[in-house]
Amino acid sequence: MSLQVQSAISLKPFNTFGVDVQARLFAEAHSDDDVREALAYSARHDVPLLVIGGGSNLLLSADVQSLVVRMASRGIRIVHEDCLESIVEAEAGEPWHPFVQSCLELGLAGLENLSLIPGTVGAAPMQNIGAYGVEIKDVFHSLTALDRETGELREFSLQDCAFGYRDSVFKHQVARWLILRVRFKLSRVARLHLEYGPVRQRLDEQGIDRPTPFDVSRAICAIRSEKLPDPAVLGNAGSFFKNPIIAAELYATIKQQHPGVVGYPQDDGQVKLAAGWLIEQAGWKGYRDGDAGVHKLQSLVLVNYGQASGLQLLSLARRIQTDIAERFGVELEMEPNLY
């Protein structure tokens, strides 16, 4: 058995909030065989299995009475290419931002707007991660997942994944599917997405009127670094709440009472609100209770100033949710998975 299972391991290094809880059992999976061994170990010892990647989408509220398996598989390869595009396959454990940079270095465009997002390749489709006008679904080709019920491999197409806003079939069937590797369809002819104002403004300030994908990536890295705290310095999980999508009638009511509300019309007639604006308007920006707080520059980000527990962070999140619901009639949904 190559899988090394350890007991009573702190998960503080394995979640970007830096919450110090223990895993009853812990192992790292470097291959498909390791994953299968972990499933067999879980069944043999009747212990639940929790699979994690970079730990950037977790809020751990208590010690984890499971076998925690960290996906550590690595590998990037081009599986198909022609003069216009390439299909790039990456193992689930590949860190996301270095993968984006590797693709740019290969002359492949499409992922640049998703630069500097924490986490791993395998976790990206689960959330259908997105930023600055681009989502995973826009560059997705297919993926390979292990069916935890049967032990068989299955290929998922774009349609199979049922991608939505920060959503996918894998998020709803997390106990069944374990993503092993993901393939992306990337272009050799850049089609840049510069609709997001600050990106265009940053490029203009630098005198770049014909940007390359690398230029866009660097601009987005600079913007994210200014807006969002580095988890290595200040514990956080990035954007903590989803931007809520509400009925147009509710949006009109809110806008009448709060003319400055930020809303984005959707194709189905609903309106997406900026959750950060709601939280800031409610006075939570920069709030701190012990070591749990709301970031002073970005109200969408909850932070751990050092020793906050998962329960303290969760309590703060619940208070914010209640306040926003009472003030605006809007329900905020947490992005991180709660354990």
Swiss-Prot record:
It catalyses: UDP-N-acetyl-alpha-D-muramate + NADP(+) = UDP-N-acetyl-3-O-(1-carboxyvinyl)-alpha-D-glucosamine + NADPH + H(+). Its cofactor is FAD. InterPro entries: FAD-bd_PCMH, FAD-bd_PCMH-like_sf, FAD-bd_PCMH_sub1, FAD-bd_PCMH_sub2, MurB, MurB_C, MurB_C_sf, Oxid_FAD_bind_N. One of its GO terms (molecular function) is FAD binding. Pathway: Cell wall biogenesis; peptidoglycan biosynthesis. Gene3D superfamilies: 3.30.465.10, UDP-N-acetylenolpyruvoylglucosamine reductase, C-terminal domain, Uridine Diphospho-n-acetylenolpyruvylglucosamine Reductase, domain 2. It is found in: Cytoplasm. The active site is at R166, S239, E335. GO terms for cellular component: cytosol. It holds the Pfam family MurB_C. The keyword Cell cycle applies. Keywords: Cell cycle, Cell division, Cell shape, Cell wall biogenesis/degradation, Cytoplasm, FAD, Flavoprotein, NADP, Oxidoreductase, Peptidoglycan synthesis. One of its GO terms (biological process) is cell division. The keyword Transit peptide does not apply. Belongs to the MurB family. NCBIfam families: murB (TIGR00179), PRK00046.1 (NF000755), PRK13903.1 (NF010478). HAMAP family: MurB. Cell wall formation. This is UDP-N-acetylenolpyruvoylglucosamine reductase. It comes from Pseudomonas syringae pv. syringae (strain B728a). The gene is murB.
